[in-house]
């Protein structure tokens, strides 16, 4: 009878994980080291309506996924990441939002002897409130102290544990005596699965503004290269047209060739003061004119020299 119950439980588990993989296009592979049952229950409650947490043996999860590859071959990308104490968090919501909910459910924890430190632990300079009889304990750890008003005072910040170090018994005892809980434990996102793609959780930190900025930088670089080599692209053509138009204006200024815009430029060169006065009340309506005002106001340069500066072709950096 117990064997049948076990077999039934396995069958139901396989059906459940396959159902979740079919229903949810996105999930996290999360590490659950040092997460207790009470904390796991709290996490499940906080994610209710937003996500579903599924834990289990790695062999069972791999077997269920392999049996479902015919229907969804993209799931094979998950198999290399199912190792260690891991589980799944399935969701249809915004991934950064669910990630933030998982981070909010981390709980502080005391250092235990033999544990691997996930982060650096620094003991700040402070009056410990401990009696002088503990001085030898601090000396054994290489911590400089003095006796102040009958208690031990740590004189400077001390890096006690580095990331990846194994916590020793002395370090754990000291942190407990000082009521310092240096670590925090919770479900740690190791990989993200999103509609057939698997990527690291750092990608979730990339915002739309950052993508927009990178895209504009790329467009600017392409336009700059294409302008230099004379190869037309969508990014460089507007600048090429502007540069060509400026060259035509420069030719018209130097010769008798005339067209409406060239006539205006020649009129400005003939009487720069008239242009400066006319441009003042119509700044918003004449952006090109605004560009000429500071140039015309500089001393020791002729109007023709100023116009040549303005007509110089644009070169992107």
UniProtKB/Swiss-Prot annotation:
Return the GO cellular component terms, semicolon-separated. cytosolic large ribosomal subunit
Record keywords, A-Z? Phosphoprotein, Ribonucleoprotein, Ribosomal protein
Tell me one GO molecular function of this protein: structural constituent of ribosome
Quick one: a GO biological-process term for this protein? ribosomal large subunit assembly
Task: Fetch the Gene3D superfamilies from UniProt.
Answer: 3.30.70.1730, 3.90.105.20
Pfam annotation, one family = Ribosomal_60s
Q: How is it modified after translation?
A: Phosphorylated.
Question: What task does this protein carry out?
Answer: Ribosomal protein P0 is the functional equivalent of E.coli protein L10.
**What's the family?**
Belongs to the universal ribosomal protein uL10 family.
**Subunit relationships:** P0 forms a pentameric complex by interaction with dimers of P1 and P2.
Instruction: Kindly give the PANTHER family that the UniProt entry links to this protein.
Output: 60S ACIDIC RIBOSOMAL PROTEIN P0, LARGE RIBOSOMAL SUBUNIT PROTEIN UL10
What name does UniProt use for this protein? Answer: Large ribosomal subunit protein uL10
Name its species: Ictalurus punctatus
Q: Could you tell me the gene encoding this protein?
A: rplp0
């Amino acid at each position: 009878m117990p064997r049948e119950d076990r077999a039934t439980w396995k069958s139901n588990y396989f059906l459940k994980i396959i159902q979740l993989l079919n229903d949810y296009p996105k999930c996290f592979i999360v590490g659950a080291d040092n997460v207790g049952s009470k904390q796991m229950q709290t996490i499940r409650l906080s994610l209710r309506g937003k996500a579903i947490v599924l834990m289990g043996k790695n062999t069972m999860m791999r077997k269920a996924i392999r049996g479902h590859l015919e229907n969804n071959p993209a799931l094979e990308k998950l198999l290399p990441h199912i190792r260690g104490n891991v589980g799944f968090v399935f969701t249809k919501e915004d991934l950064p939002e669910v990630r933030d909910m998982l981070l909010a459910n981390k709980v502080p924890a005391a250092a235990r002897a033999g544990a691997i430190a996930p982060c650096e632990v620094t003991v700040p300079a402070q009056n410990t409130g401990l009696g002088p009889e503990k001085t030898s304990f601090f000396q054994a750890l290489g911590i400089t102290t003095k006796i102040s008003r009958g208690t031990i005072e740590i004189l400077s910040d001390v890096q006690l544990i580095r990331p990846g170090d194994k916590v020793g018994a002395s370090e754990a005892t000291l942190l407990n005596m000082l009521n310092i809980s240096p670590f925090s434990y919770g479900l740690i996102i190791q990989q993200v699965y999103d509609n057939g793609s698997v990527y690291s959780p750092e990608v979730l930190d990339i915002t739309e503004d950052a993508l927009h900025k990178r895209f504009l930088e790329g467009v600017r670089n392409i336009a700059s290269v294409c302008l230099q080599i004379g190869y037309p692209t969508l990014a460089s053509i507007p600048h090429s047209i502007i540069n060509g138009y400026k060259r035509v204006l420069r030719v018209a200024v130097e010769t008798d060739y005339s067209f409406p815009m060239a006539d205006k430029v020649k009129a400005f060169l003939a009487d720069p003061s008239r242009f400066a006065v006319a441009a003042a009340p119509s700044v918003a309506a004449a952006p090109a004119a605004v560009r000429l005002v500071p140039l015309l106001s500089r001393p020791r340069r002729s109007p023709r020299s100023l116009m040549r500066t303005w007509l110089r072709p644009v070169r992107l950096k």
